[in-house]
Amino acid sequence: MQYKTFLLPASGSEQTEENLNVFLRTHRIVSVRTEFVAGETLAWCVFVEFV
């Protein structure tokens, strides 16, 4: 298995969202886990497991 993480700002980032969508469309995804991160900046952390 391989892993990749994405950090999506809660305020939105079209480029980051597009990067995530392209990655998901072009890889064999095993699982996706999301967690909301409330630190200095608010964001969604997306953890992708793929083959």
Can you describe what each PLM-predicted range is?
Residues 3-5, 18-19, 50:
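Intrinsic disorder/low-complexity segments enriched in polar/small residues
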Residues 6, 29-32, 46-48:
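Hydrophobic beta-strand residues in large extracellular and virion-surface proteins
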Residues 13-35:
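A short, charged, amphipathic alpha-helix used as a generic interaction element across diverse proteins
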Residues 1-3, 27, 43:
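Sequence-level motif detector for i,i+2 pairs with an aromatic at +2
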